[in-house]
Amino acid sequence: MCATMENLPDCTQSVGRSSATSLQSNPQMDSITVFAQNYYGMTLILGIALLIFGGHLLVEGSVAIATRLGISKLVIGLTIVAFSTSSPELALNIIASMNGHSELCLGNIFGSNIANIGLVLGIGALICKLPVTGRIIKVEFPLLIFATLIVGVATLIGTLNAYWAIGFLCLFSFLMWTWFRIGNEDESQVAMQSEGAISEVQYSTIGAWAMLLTGLVLLALGGKATEIGAVTGALSLGMSEIVVGGTVVAIATSLPEVVTTIIAAKKGHPDLAVGNVVGSNIFNILFVLPITILVNPISISSDVWLYVVVMFVMTVLAWFLTMDSRIKPKEGGILVGLYIAFLAYVTFSIVT
């Protein structure tokens, strides 16, 4: 019998390992096990829904407050909107890291980056050609590749500690300074590109703050619910935390980007897709990951390597596909196909 919430994963794992024996001795155990798995499945779904909705409220409230304070759309687009795309991952990782679930955190970050390229860019390119600015090709993509390579080196060493976190945050700060400096040289163009991601709805000051605070609360609740559902559900099914974080949770937390890309493409703003994906992936590695590390240092297991390699290969491939300043539908099909192959390999590994 588990007395505390922290003991839930251990108890669930024990139930999962002994389920075959227990079913022979207790016919009622089958329905009990199914109910437990459904419960944690519903908890996972509820947690993800809270993360997505909480992130939406957070960005709506933040944008409204920033607008009322006279902050330009350029600054909003480069900071708040970029943060909003990674807020579900950040909320989940902080809570999961506090409870020692480091593999779930890494799976969430790496899996989200893989899904952003394979699903978001792939599906967006299948709908229409995605134009890519020269700045993304020459600055943001190489920086993303460099950051991904550094993460690979860190995983090879075996531990992600505070030194790595400080290094990532320094690089992120330099990138933010570069964004603002380059943005000021051509503010009108960047502001116009960011405009499609910023709501035009006007809210009162009280309403904006209410949305922001409600969003933060929902993110906290959603992060805890997702952690419980993912960890305990995975263990009951014999899956590792990194598999759940890198597939189920990663796909779910990337759904807002998928929907946004589809809507942007249909409304004639496909240029937002590549910039949003690259920005979100940079944010995940250079901000979400170091914050997670500062909460609790991460020890790397051998299972993490698959996700690091796939993330690096997908990132480099996407960069090469943008060399002619666009991603064509057939190239989008390649990205989606590779992502499906990745999921198939992970599924096959679980089964075997």
Task: Briefly describe each language-model feature range.
Residues C2-S19, L23-T352:
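Hydrophobic alpha-helical segments, chiefly the membrane-spanning helices
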